[in-house]
């Protein structure tokens, strides 16, 4: 049976010009660029790319994405949100609600956040997350919790938080980088993949023997080993070289690991 893992792109790489000395891709042109350059059919959109944009502009971007056949799938927040604050997490809940409103106008089905989870306030974080999810549901948007924040529990702890929150509107969005930092990449991926709607395939560069920090095929094999059949977002985090060519290289290696030679539309 053919794997159903679908490659998408984290648009954070598009802050950089695709050609040396050129200009970055304009926000409204991102979906068409991703579709035509990489043949991908989905985008993870960092929230800072739309900061200051009007609702009309976000709806226009959604229209362009639909027209290009490259929808905006997840609106992601990099800066941590404090859901365990002593003020009952009201500020964090409001930030998530605002993300949900933006996601609705963009056509994103999920927002992804990094939450600060102090060990002594896990119960408060869970209660606040439930309140935030109630607000997100009004916009038909789900919540994904990202790993990697210094106060976030290990993968097992994050999985436990997601189980305790419960329901169909909560999930995880782990990354290869965070799984590698945990110390046992395969174990971290296997723990969180069953709760994940999207996984970030972090790519930092390539050497003579392949990816420079971890084996992309081993990471994909860990996903396949637990039956993961959802989104895998190519997340370029390198600082050297032709990033477009290197994203193409990552795409080829990931497709080979998934078991396909080309992206399925």
Language model region names:
Residues 2-3, 32, 64-77, 81-174, ...:
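Active-site acidic/histidine proton-transfer and metal-coordination neighborhood
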Residues 41-63, 115-120:
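Glycine-rich, proline-tolerant flexible connector loops at the mouths of alpha/beta enzymes
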Residues 21, 51-52, 90, 123, ...:
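Residue-level marker of alpha-helix boundaries and capping positions
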Residues 26-48, 102-109:
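Catalytic domains of carbohydrate-active enzymes, especially glycoside hydrolases
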Residues 57-67, 127-138, 188-191, 218-223:
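Catalytic-core regions built around general acid/base machinery
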Residues 49-50, 80, 118, 151, ...:
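Positions that flank functional sites
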Residues 11, 38-47, 74-79:
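Short, conserved active-site loops that position catalytic residues or coordinate cofactors/metal ions
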């Amino acid at each position: 049976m053919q794997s159903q893992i679908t490659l998408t792109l984290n648009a954070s790489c598009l802050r950089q010009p695709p050609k040396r000395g050129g200009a970055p891709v304009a926000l409204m042109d991102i979906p068409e660029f991703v579709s035509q350059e990489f043949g991908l059919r989905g985008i993870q959109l960092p929230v800072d790319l739309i900061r200051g944009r009007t609702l009309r502009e976000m709806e226009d971007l959604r229209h362009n994405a639909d027209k290009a056949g490259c929808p905006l799938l997840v609106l992601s927040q990099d800066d941590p949100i404090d859901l365990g604050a002593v003020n009952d997490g009201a500020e964090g809940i409001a930030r998530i609600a605002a993300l949900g409103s933006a996601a609705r106008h963009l056509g994103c089905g999920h927002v992804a956040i990094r939450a600060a989870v102090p060990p002594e306030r896990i119960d408060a974080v869970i209660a606040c997350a439930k309140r935030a999810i109630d607000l997100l549901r009004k916009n038909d948007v789900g919540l994904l919790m990202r790993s990697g924040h210094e106060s976030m529990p290990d993968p097992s702890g994050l999985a436990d938080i997601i189980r305790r929150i419960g329901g169909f509107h909560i999930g995880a969005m782990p990354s290869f980088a965070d799984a590698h930092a945990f110390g046992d990449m395969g174990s971290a991926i296997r723990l969180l993949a069953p709760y994940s709607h999207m996984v970030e395939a972090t790519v930092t560069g390539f050497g003579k023997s392949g990816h420079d920090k971890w084996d992309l095929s081993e990471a994909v094999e860990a996903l396949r080993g637990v039956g993961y059949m959802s989104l895998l977002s190519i997340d370029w985090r390198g600082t050297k070289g032709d990033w477009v060519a290197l994203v193409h290289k990552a795409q080829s290696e990931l497709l080979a690991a998934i078991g396909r030679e080309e992206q399925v539309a």
